[in-house]
Curated annotation (Swiss-Prot):
This is Ribonuclease HII. Belongs to the RNase HII family. GO terms for molecular function: manganese ion binding; RNA binding; RNA-DNA hybrid ribonuclease activity. Gene3D superfamilies: Ribonuclease H-like superfamily/Ribonuclease H (3.30.420.10). Its cofactor is Mn(2+); Mg(2+). Keywords: Cytoplasm, Endonuclease, Hydrolase, Manganese, Metal-binding, Nuclease. Endonuclease that specifically degrades the RNA of RNA-DNA hybrids. CDD domains: RNase_HII_bacteria_HII_like.
């Protein structure tokens, strides 16, 4: 008895590799619905394979450390919030488990929000250790954004429940005695930094959403403190609040 297209599709969707798909008995079924199902499954498998290859590439720097130091405890560090006109700069320090496998990890700005939230929950529940560090708008104004970012990163490291032995940092160097590697675009090149990027992004977005409840005019829940049209119009209308960065333009020129 010939299987229905729905039944064949279920069989096809259970296939786990492209090779298996091409050798499947249904591969030669010429019905359009079956061929469409095969094409969809191939596309999904190709996407999954690309994510796996990307993930392997992003473990390069971790593996280089582990070659020389098999017992290394590697901490990835990243920040979000250097560019906004309001709110803190937030850093996260993350130590992944040895058997980590978080397909889709990348620079948090490139990860769709649904996937970002999914990864964040998995990371919070499964990593060896993580901690956040915050530098306030006042500290940003006092020290400058670069120094404030360093402060936030060090606070995140200090907050870890497990002491790392090596640091992988996104485009920064820290005054820290631990061996460290600074990587330009590290959140797209290292799984440890990418994990920290995701966690810092979700934490800061949540913070700004909460802030918007007290200051709804600025639209922080949508712009995260960046200088959008709504945000700038609100500043012109009602002025600034305590979490605005007075050293950032155009706010600086308004004072």
């Amino acid at each position: 008895m010939t299987l229905t297209i729905k039944e064949v599709t279920q069989l096809i969707n259970a296939v786990n590799t492209i090779e298996e798909l091409e050798n499947h008995e249904c591969f030669l079924d010429e019905r359009k619905g079956v061929q469409n199902a095969i094409a969809r499954r191939r596309k999904a498998l190709e996407k999954e394979q690309a994510l796996k290859e990307k993930y392997v590439e992003m473990t390069y720097f971790e593996n280089e450390i582990l070659k020389e130091h098999p017992n290394a405890i590697i901490c990835g560090i990243d920040e979000v919030g250097r560019g906004p006109l309001a709110g803190p700069v937030v850093a996260c320090a993350t130590i992944l488990n040895s058997n980590h496998n978080y397909l889709g990890l990348d620079d948090s700005k490139k990860v769709p929000i649904t996937k970002r939230l999914e990864l964040n929950e998995a990371l919070k529940n499964e990593v060896t250790a993580f901690a956040y560090g915050i530098a306030t708008a006042e500290e940003i104004d006092e020290f400058n954004i670069y120094k404030a970012t360093q402060i936030a990163m060090q606070r995140a490291i200090d907050g870890l429940s497990v002491q790392p032995t090596h640091l992988l940092i996104d485009a920064m160097t820290l005054d820290n005695a631990l061996p460290q590697v600074s990587l330009i675009k590290g959140d797209a090149r290292s799984v440890s930094i990418a994990a920290a990027s995701i966690m810092a992004k979700v934490f800061r977005d949540d913070y700004m959403t909460q802030l918007s409840k007290d200051y709804p005019e600025y639209g922080f829940e949508k712009n995260a403190g960046y200088g959008t049209k709504q945000h700038l119009l609100a500043i012109d209308d009602i002025g600034i609040m305590k979490e605005h960065r007075k050293s950032f333009e155009p706010i600086k020129s308004l004072l």
